[in-house]
């Protein structure tokens, strides 16, 4: 089965500004903020709208990953490329995740957002973070690795565990490619199912403004804008650091690899606003997979890099972990030597690898890190518990951008990037809102 070729069609009528998804999501976020601020009780009641939308998106994440990975791998002529793509992706993830941790450490030492607070560790209530500490205690490297192997393929798809789905999908894709032409009927079915699944993603994205409105109204109504005032300096430091990481570090990576970080941000602006509104990068995962394919990244690369990156390439979470850990130490007047900070960095490198793209995962990984580093009191997390929700948006957005950049970079390294399609997508010549644009299809006979 050959790749799907776009059929000639009449040019689309230009959309009015309010018909664009990013405008609708932005307006929904603004309305949610106003409702949560002026009518907090009513705002908190909007939570089911955000939860329902995230559940709708999570419903399609597992099948989207399965179909993308299987059809991508089975359509490759050289299966050795699968190993090369995975290896290059892990090198990229390890390099930039470590760099993000180091940047968070440096900024915390230079800016010192917790200095002068003089909070006695004995005065902190450990019960406030007990549930997070318990979740962190249950996590271990061996347990994390063993959990990647699903009990059954159905349980992986049913639970929606990204790494379990990815693990089975890679094995099944390799097996399907191994049977050659006999697997083509199965491949044809999967390609058609993939196209139908992405059409479903388009349908679900129409509800994004409702989900963003509900999630933002709840956040402001529940926590209040005023709750950030006392720790505004920490929040500001984290936001500025993440912004500079995206613009400077990822910007240089993008420029070196032949594209503009700002053009990429324009290309994924709808997804970024969705992540901002829902505080979950998972909410935009299916849409990111589709957009990276349309931007010229080969399906097999997209299917491997993005799902893996959601656990191993968390730049925003890594910046947050070292910055927050040093903030707690500074606020409680605990001096961390260079050796203590290096230990903190090494532990954070390991504990951050199991975080999923869900709200609150960064807080749990921070608890896992502090539970291993005895110098910083775990109870100190109570200091940032109230504002963590306001920092999770920035974590999720930075993680999301990092995975978009990683996908393009790894595709280029592997020679699986269509530079003309990338240029067309980033310049706006390809509209991903057009319903008649086909999804790339691959087959064993390609």
Curated annotation (Swiss-Prot):
Protein name: C4-dicarboxylate transport protein
Database matches in Gene3D superfamilies: Sodium:dicarboxylate symporter
Sequence similarity: Belongs to the dicarboxylate/amino acid:cation symporter (DAACS) (TC 2.A.23) family.
GO molecular-function terms, A-Z: fumarate transmembrane transporter activity; malate:proton symporter activity; succinate transmembrane transporter activity
Any one Gene Ontology cellular component term annotated for this protein: plasma membrane
Function: Responsible for the transport of dicarboxylates such as succinate, fumarate, and malate from the periplasm across the membrane.
Keyword annotations of the record: Cell inner membrane, Cell membrane, Membrane, Symport, Transmembrane, Transmembrane helix, Transport
Species annotation: Azorhizobium caulinodans (strain ATCC 43989 / DSM 5975 / JCM 20966 / LMG 6465 / NBRC 14845 / NCIMB 13405 / ORS 571)
